[in-house]
Amino acid sequence: MYKNLEEHNRLVNKYLKIFFVVSLYWCTSILTVFVNKHLLSSDTVNLGAPLFMSWFQCVVSTVICFVASRLSRKYPSVFTFPEGNPLDIDTFRKILPLSVLYTLMIGANNLSLSYVTVAFYYIGRSLTTVFSVVLTYVILRQRTSFKCLLCCGAIVVGFWLGVDQESLTEVFSWRGTIFGVLSSLALAMFSIQTKKSLGYVNQEVWLLSYYNNLYSTLLFLPLIIINGELESIITYPHLWASWFWAAMTLSGLCGFAIGFVTALEIKVTSALTHNISGTAKACAQTVIATQYYHDVRSALWWTSNVVVLVASAAYTRVKQLEMMRQHQQRSTATQKA
């Protein structure tokens, strides 16, 4: 009886931890999207350099981690930061694939956000679950059940319905939609690669975030030039305004927070759970955006949101039941042994 009670308490604590981390991810992610959209498209800021903004977010994150690392060495009893050397060649070689995916993910993400509304922004991200299933099979050789595949099919239907309805509006952008899909693909790959990369840094999320952002600051520089953003930055009328850099710093802080919380959510749950959490969060974000920006959408447009949400929830439930069944089978086998 005591063993069952102890197991129950352990399970409750685990669920509470997961709930807290997922809630933190939701709040941080939604705030980041609205801040970035304000910087990219608002009448007051309208920077028009999404990759430069992504680069600056990585710079802020790198500085925070560097300062934390130095404080930890000087005041170890007050500050704690894992030991590591980002300039180590072996470390660079191991973490670089994750940094490439991270650069692609946040770069495509901000490019998409610069073209589409916040309300439609989630549509491209809704395919993350589908990409995750495909990549899990291609990379990890793990098969997915027929029920899960049906749910993925429904998600694709919801995605195309949303694109079809959005294309009827004046604010629709194919370029923004394509960048959104590309960001979803990068996120699915990033989630899988994160689990592997955490093993290289002894499961230290802070250290992985430090390496990842530092390497990404280097990767973004040629992309900024290729995207033709140098002229936009140099000729930007508010470049030396204090309020502009304050807004950029806030965006950088949000970027650091979302990077850390994303890695933390993957660590305490799984890559799949993180992808599903991101999709569900995006649906809530859509409702908030339509209210905040006073967007009026058609019934079919809202139907696409519902289809994606229900299909994602069904996928989550199916995966949960499959995991519970596997756990029971392992427990039964252990008891027999």
Swiss-Prot record:
Cellular-component GO terms for this entry: Golgi apparatus; Golgi membrane; Golgi-associated vesicle
Which locations, inside or outside the cell, does it occupy? Golgi apparatus membrane
**Is-annotated flag, keyword Transport?**
yes
Sorted alphabetically, which InterPro entries does this protein's record hold? Sugar_P_trans_dom (IPR004853), TPT_transporter (IPR050186)
One Pfam family matching this protein: TPT
Major place of localization? Golgi
Keywords, A to Z?
Answer: Golgi apparatus, Membrane, Sugar transport, Transmembrane, Transmembrane helix, Transport
Effect noted on mutating residue 29 to L: In nac1; abolishes GDP-fucose transport into the Golgi lumen. Shows lack of both core alpha-1,3- and alpha-1,6-linked fucose residues on N-glycans. Reduces neural expression of the HRP epitope
Q: Which domain of life is it from?
A: Eukaryota
The topology of this chain with respect to the membrane is: Multi-pass membrane protein
Membrane-spanning ranges: 13-35, 45-67, 95-117, 121-140, 145-163, 173-192, 205-227, 242-264
The molecular function terms of the Gene Ontology recorded here are:
antiporter activity; GDP-fucose transmembrane transporter activity
**Is Ribosomal protein there in the keyword field?**
no
**Which is a GO BP term held by this UniProt record?**
GDP-fucose transmembrane transport
Q: For this UniProt entry, which residues form the secretion signal?
A: none
UniProt record similarity statement? Belongs to the TPT transporter family. SLC35C subfamily.
Tell me, what does this protein do in biology? Involved in GDP-fucose import from the cytoplasm into the Golgi lumen. Plays a major role in the fucosylation of N-glycans. Functions redundantly with Efr in the O-fucosylation of Notch, positively regulating Notch signaling.
What name appears for this protein in its UniProt entry? GDP-fucose transporter, Golgi
